[in-house]
Amino acid sequence: MDLLKKEYTGVTYISGPLLFVENAKDLSYGAIVDIRDGTGRVRGGQVIEVSEEYAVIQVFEETTGLDLATTTVSLVEDVARL
């Protein structure tokens, strides 16, 4: 892991291809993220909604094997900000 890469561990809910992460309001709509499960497997995803309480991430691959306790999210590519 890159020392400057922020990792989010507050995954609170998984529903189909959607992952809900608490305390991730600094993520931006459209940002590309890596989702890592407890075994180290990495999946890609994109932030599709951000609010004060949570961020919603669409996972590009299946979510089987992801669990709330061990899944982490890290930013790969942020979107341009004006």
Model-based region annotation:
Residues 1-7, 13-82:
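Acidic-enriched and Gly/Ser
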